[in-house]
Design a protein with these regions (language model features):
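Cytosolic regulatory regions built on CNB/CRP/Popeye-like sensor folds
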Residues: 1-162
Length: 162
């Protein structure tokens, strides 16, 4: 896998108010006052198939809203083998764990051509404390990720996961 440097993936800044999938993403419920709290640019980025969005253990620069494509989250075992832990689709949040830890706990790789918005951690922390709308949406996304993991574990334990 060839890593993609952030500079080559950057396509400009995003206009979150005009996003075509805004109703699916973290900023779905924000109002004009909430948008006024955003004091850093939201980066519009694109990655080709196999593009590395971030590596396991990297210091987090932000969280990513997946606008188009699919991303796999991969963890490495102690002996160097890789395991896919989740596949994310449009509307999902990539790197959500960084809000709690400041680091990414897996590697994020584009499964096809991917478009994401990178939201700086500072923006997320500021909005989550000052906007109940973002805080509620963030809790919904955490719950969706947890439910997906729980469902997968249940399928694995009951024999339907392949």
């Amino acid at each position: 896998m060839i890593p993609i440097h952030v500079e080559s993936a950057w396509k400009g800044t995003s206009d979150c108010r005009a996003c075509g999938i805004r109703d699916l993403v973290l900023f779905a419920d924000l109002n004009e006052d909430d948008f006024g709290l955003i004091h850093a640019p939201i980066d519009d980025m694109a990655y080709p198939v196999g593009g590395l969005i971030y590596s396991e253990g990297d210091k987090a620069l932000g969280v990513f809203t997946l606008r188009q494509g699919m991303v796999k989250l991969v963890r490495s075992t102690a002996d160097g083998r890789e395991r896919i832990i989740r596949v994310l689709r449009a509307g999902d949040v990539v790197g959500i764990e960084a809000l709690a830890t400041g680091h990414y706990d897996s590697e994020a790789v584009a499964l096809n051509d991917v478009k994401v918005c990178r939201i700086p951690l500072g923006v997320m922390h500021n909005l989550s404390t000052q906007s109940p709308r973002l805080h509620n949406r963030l809790m919904q996304k955490w719950q969706q990720a947890l439910k997906g993991a729980d469902d997968w574990l249940a399928d694995l334990n009951f024999g339907t996961a392949r």
